[in-house]
UniProtKB/Swiss-Prot annotation:
A zinc finger (C2H2-type) spans 404-429. Signal peptide: none annotated. GO terms for molecular function: RNA binding; zinc ion binding. It comes from Schizosaccharomyces pombe (strain 972 / ATCC 24843). InterPro entries: G_patch_dom, Nucleotide-bd_a/b_plait_sf, RBD_domain_sf, RRM_dom, Znf_RanBP2. This is Uncharacterized RNA-binding protein C57A7.13. It holds the Pfam family G-patch. SMART domains: G_patch, RRM. SUPFAM superfamilies: RNA-binding domain, RBD. Coiled coil: none annotated. GO terms for biological process: mRNA splicing, via spliceosome; regulation of heterochromatin formation; regulation of mRNA cis splicing, via spliceosome.
């Protein structure tokens, strides 16, 4: 097995293919390359770049560079008509364990750019396949150049200064610009991508309990930062210093937590109006601002090492590569930061729904009037306590039943259910029962109410219509006539019309005299009864005794009818 990753390995490959370093140089000259390649300097094979489209030339020396081993390989020199399926079949035929194949196309025309990428299942699979098939693969009778993709390059040697974000050579022990030692302000370049993280993306103008301090010296510690904040004379609850997870290096900005928004606003005003050159820490002017809501986010899947508690739950910093190093000043109670546990109320058993409620399918929108009707029914029917006779006499002592008024509290209600709720659950009613002055005045008023309700009803309107000189017998007859129907009165306009049409008393209406024989009695709805309810209508002129008789008569005929059936 040849070692393709050494310089001798390249020379052996070129000799097998009938090429030498000299004719490679001639080939490069004929193709107008920038670099002159000679046998004395074979290392230039890895660094030269052609001026033209190198991906289309499968015979160029660049295509014979195997590259840095990784899971992806690049296939160059494909025909424009080839598809991903053809590439997959060719790779599977050679025993390649490929997971995905991506053919690169033009964005506008979607035409093939004649090169593709193939990703293997593992790094070892790609190495084994390249050792067996490098440098070409035959697809549809055409030799296609294969090598490792350039995505995985060798790690850059060097380190980045955390204090000034300047790249330094690996042999430097201190930053050449700010002279900070390497062990205090360095990040190894390689697996971690270096980007400027200075807190500029966390700034907001919306007031909150958090303030962000930017442009801090990256060599500061928690104690040093806290001592510098003491000159502002502010009440800080916690200090969050933003650090990298992989080496705990300070990023140069921190977040302060206050008790409420008023405290943070005072601290912001003090920092921005600080006398002299402004608010400084370690001889550096510090920028102070609010943070937005997306800086500290809920910790759903984050490790417990990086999250911190608050009253609303556990939070983490939004950047996955950074975390908050917490410093709590002396004298601050840490129990106040624990999340508040919410006790879940046990689910109550569902009560049987009343037949008065109107069921509506969940998929349809409930009309406003229908929803209002259901809510009113629930309010009247639900949670009304049952009272015994003794309790009712005691509790309803100050209730004007006919008017639905609590005389003691001087409150009028819309339904009997509201009255019962008031006398059993109202705190005001219980307090008024202990007030002797209110109780005595309510007793007097209820005495008058009972006297008024005990007097028989007099139809004073009918009495005023009667001639003053009439006898008592005439008054009684007029009273009876007012309670009865006015259908039989001869002075009635309707009666005169019927008589002129030939109608006789006792016969039915209509040509065949098969219509109604009795007058239609005027009726009204009982108060508090819903529309359509059976027995909701009563005659206007009927007394309570007549109503009981009419009800008994209807029940008798109904039972008699059922027995006959």
């Amino acid at each position: 097995m040849k070692d393709y990753y050494s310089e001798n390995g390249f020379e052996e490959i070129f000799e097998e293919k009938g090429s030498t370093s000299s004719n490679i140089s001639d080939n490069c000259a004929s193709r107008d390359y920038d670099v002159n390649i000679s046998s004395d300097n074979p290392r230039l094979l890895d660094s030269y770049r052609p001026k033209g489209n190198y991906g289309r030339d499968r015979n160029s020396p660049l295509s014979r560079h195997i590259g840095v081993p990784n899971q992806e390989i690049i296939l160059q020199g494909l025909t424009p008509e080839i598809l991903e399926e053809h590439i997959e079949l060719a790779l599977y035929a050679t025993g390649a364990k490929v997971s995905t194949v991506t053919l690169i196309r033009e964005k506008e025309t979607q035409k093939s750019r004649c090169f593709a990428f193939a990703k293997f299942v593992s790094l070892q699979d790609s190495k084994d396949w390249m050792e067996a098939n490098f440098p070409t693969l035959v697809i549809d009778g055409i030799d296609v150049s294969v090598r490792f993709s350039r995505a995985a390059r060798e790690q850059i040697e060097g380190w980045c200064c955390q204090n000034c974000d300047i790249l330094n050579y690996s042999y430097r022990e201190s930053c050449f610009k700010c002279r900070v030692p390497r062990n205090q302000a360095s990040i190894a370049i390689g697996n971690h991508k270096i980007s400027k993280r200075n807190g500029d993306m966390d700034v907001s103008d919306v007031p909150s309990v958090y303030l962000i301090l930017r442009n801090l010296d990256r060599s500061l510690s928690e104690e040093t930062l806290w001592k510098g904040l003491s000159k502002l004379e502010i009440d800080v609850q916690r200090v969050f210093m933003i650090r990298y997870k992989f080496n705990d290096a300070f990023c140069g900005y921190a977040i302060l937590e206050f008790k409420d928004v008023d405290e943070s606003a005072k601290a912001l005003m003090k920092a921005r109006t600080y006398p002299g050159k402004g608010f400084t820490l370690a001889s550096r002017k510090v920028s102070v601002d609010y943070i937005h809501d997306g800086v500290l986010i809920p910790a759903y899947t984050e490790s417990a090492r990086w999250q911190f508690p608050t009253k609303t739950g556990y939070l983490v910093y939004w950047d996955p590569e950074l975390y908050c190093s917490i410093y709590v000043p002396e004298g601050i109670d840490t129990d106040q930061f624990k999340p508040i546990e919410v006790n879940k109320k046990p689910k109550k058993e569902k009560r049987a729904r009343s037949s008065n409620y109107i069921d509506v399918p969940a998929s349809k929108k409930v009309a406003t009037s229908l929803q209002r009707w259901n809510d009113a029914q629930k309010e009247l029917k639900d949670n009304i306590p049952d009272l015994s006779e003794e309790e009712e006499k005691l509790l309803l002592h100050f209730v004007w039943k006919s008017a639905l008024i609590c005389v003691l509290c001087e409150r009028k209600f819309q339904s009997w259910g509201h009255v019962v709720k008031h006398i059993t659950q109202s705190i005001m009613h219980n307090n008024n029962l202990k007030n002797h002055e209110l109780v005595s005045s309510a007793e007097l008023l209820m005495h008058r109410v009972r006297q008024t309700e005990s007097v028989d009803y007099r139809d004073r309107a009918t009495e005023r219509r009667i001639v003053p000189a009439a006898s008592s017998d005439t008054i009684v007859e007029a009273k009876k006539s007012s309670q009865g129907s006015s259908f039989h009165s001869t002075s009635n306009v309707s009666m005169k019309m019927l008589n002129s049409m030939g109608w006789n008393k006792g016969s039915g209406l209509g040509t065949n005299e098969n219509g109604i024989k009795e007058a239609i009695q005027p009726t009204m709805y009982l108060p508090g009864v819903g529309l359509g309810n059976k027995g909701s209508k009563i005659q206007i002129n009927m007394t309570p005794v007549d109503r009981v008789k009419d009800r008994a008569r209807s029940l008798y005929f109904q039972n008699d009818k059922n027995n006959n059936l």
